[in-house]
Amino acid sequence: MNHVVKHNHTAVTKVTEFILMGITDNPGLQAPLFGLFLIIYLVTVIGNLGMVILTYLDSKLHTPMYFFLRHLSITDLGYSTVIAPKMLVNFIVHKNTISYNWYATQLAFFEIFIISELFILSAMAYDRYVAICKPLLYVIIMAEKVLWVLVIVPYLYSTFVSLFLTIKLFKLSFCGSNIISYFYCDCIPLMSILCSDTNELELIILIFSGCNLLFSLSIVLISYMFILVAILRMNSRKGRYKAFSTCSSHLTVVIMFYGTLLFIYLQPKSSHTLAIDKMASVFYTLLIPMLNPLIYSLRNKEVKDALKRTLTNRFKIPI
């Protein structure tokens, strides 16, 4: 809804709600896509919530690696839940509206979870570096207080950045149109309907996005560089395989997540095309949160064994 307010005989349109156009406007695709994304979201919730519960209940998973994995699942569950329910509504209603304040709220929470995940992934890489390169000091370096610092600092920092960017964005003026050709609340599609000059805001977003991505990615790359050197120096083939296998799941997630974000957020505005942005956004906002727990569980014997123990001991399910 747009309200027209008159100031000194000048009509100014005040946007009070937005219309999210969704992934597609093809009527024939609405029902199939609703079913597909509903299944994806349910698998995401079950997988990530299950990982959180499993790493909490099973004492053998009370290690730094699974501590970080629990928080990775929390962030995955967080930003997918911010997006998916509202997106699913868009498939079954004629006009999917979202209020001005609720758009800002969803955007803020989405940014909190996304930025937090970047630094949790880098903390997981550092954890693998310490485990492989400094095994005798692992318990000392990765003490419980250190673990909490490595997750609380990203949560606090991401909250600050999210609030700063959201407040900065919503202080600007919007044009008459309130239609956003996107399927979730993000800052890039919203900037297309701003009346104000967006150069400063684009620069701020580019700086924050670039610094967050490159700083966290540099931690990952440096950690894996040392890990690779340590693995190549191992005499035992079995030892090299075991060391690499402990990193393979995390490395797979890192490549998918960082690759997509670098593709989306470090492009200049002129290079963005709506169709490609939507496809890339679907991948990292909906598919990656679904795939992460599957990657960590299917390729991890400890997780599979813990699941068997939990189902057998707590729920009396014979396996």
UniProtKB/Swiss-Prot annotation:
<feature type="transmembrane region" description="Helical; Name=7">
    <location>
        <begin position="278"/>
        <end position="298"/>
    </location>
</feature>
<feature type="transmembrane region" description="Helical; Name=6">
    <location>
        <begin position="244"/>
        <end position="264"/>
    </location>
</feature>
<feature type="glycosylation site" description="N-linked (GlcNAc...) asparagine">
    <location>
        <position position="8"/>
    </location>
</feature>
<dbReference type="GO" id="GO:0005886">
    <property type="term" value="C:plasma membrane"/>
</dbReference>
<comment type="similarity">
    <text>Belongs to the G-protein coupled receptor 1 family.</text>
</comment>
<protein>
    <recommendedName>
        <fullName>Olfactory receptor 8K1</fullName>
    </recommendedName>
</protein>
<feature type="transmembrane region" description="Helical; Name=5">
    <location>
        <begin position="204"/>
        <end position="223"/>
    </location>
</feature>
<keyword id="KW-0552">Olfaction</keyword>
<feature type="transmembrane region" description="Helical; Name=4">
    <location>
        <begin position="146"/>
        <end position="166"/>
    </location>
</feature>
<feature type="topological domain" description="Extracellular">
    <location>
        <begin position="82"/>
        <end position="105"/>
    </location>
</feature>
<keyword id="KW-0472">Membrane</keyword>
<feature type="transmembrane region" description="Helical; Name=3">
    <location>
        <begin position="106"/>
        <end position="126"/>
    </location>
</feature>
<dbReference type="InterPro" id="IPR017452">
    <property type="entry name" value="GPCR_Rhodpsn_7TM"/>
</dbReference>
<feature type="topological domain" description="Extracellular">
    <location>
        <begin position="167"/>
        <end position="203"/>
    </location>
</feature>
<dbReference type="InterPro" id="IPR000725">
    <property type="entry name" value="Olfact_rcpt"/>
</dbReference>
<keyword id="KW-1003">Cell membrane</keyword>
<feature type="topological domain" description="Cytoplasmic">
    <location>
        <begin position="299"/>
        <end position="319"/>
    </location>
</feature>
<keyword id="KW-1133">Transmembrane helix</keyword>
<feature type="transmembrane region" description="Helical; Name=2">
    <location>
        <begin position="61"/>
        <end position="81"/>
    </location>
</feature>
<keyword id="KW-0675">Receptor</keyword>
<keyword id="KW-0325">Glycoprotein</keyword>
<dbReference type="GO" id="GO:0004984">
    <property type="term" value="F:olfactory receptor activity"/>
</dbReference>
<comment type="function">
    <text>Odorant receptor.</text>
</comment>
<dbReference type="GO" id="GO:0004930">
    <property type="term" value="F:G protein-coupled receptor activity"/>
</dbReference>
<keyword id="KW-0297">G-protein coupled receptor</keyword>
<feature type="topological domain" description="Cytoplasmic">
    <location>
        <begin position="127"/>
        <end position="145"/>
    </location>
</feature>
<feature type="topological domain" description="Cytoplasmic">
    <location>
        <begin position="53"/>
        <end position="60"/>
    </location>
</feature>
<feature type="topological domain" description="Cytoplasmic">
    <location>
        <begin position="224"/>
        <end position="243"/>
    </location>
</feature>
<dbReference type="Pfam" id="PF13853">
    <property type="entry name" value="7tm_4"/>
</dbReference>
<keyword id="KW-0807">Transducer</keyword>
<dbReference type="InterPro" id="IPR000276">
    <property type="entry name" value="GPCR_Rhodpsn"/>
</dbReference>
<feature type="topological domain" description="Extracellular">
    <location>
        <begin position="265"/>
        <end position="277"/>
    </location>
</feature>
<feature type="transmembrane region" description="Helical; Name=1">
    <location>
        <begin position="32"/>
        <end position="52"/>
    </location>
</feature>
<feature type="topological domain" description="Extracellular">
    <location>
        <begin position="1"/>
        <end position="31"/>
    </location>
</feature>
<keyword id="KW-0812">Transmembrane</keyword>
<keyword id="KW-0716">Sensory transduction</keyword>
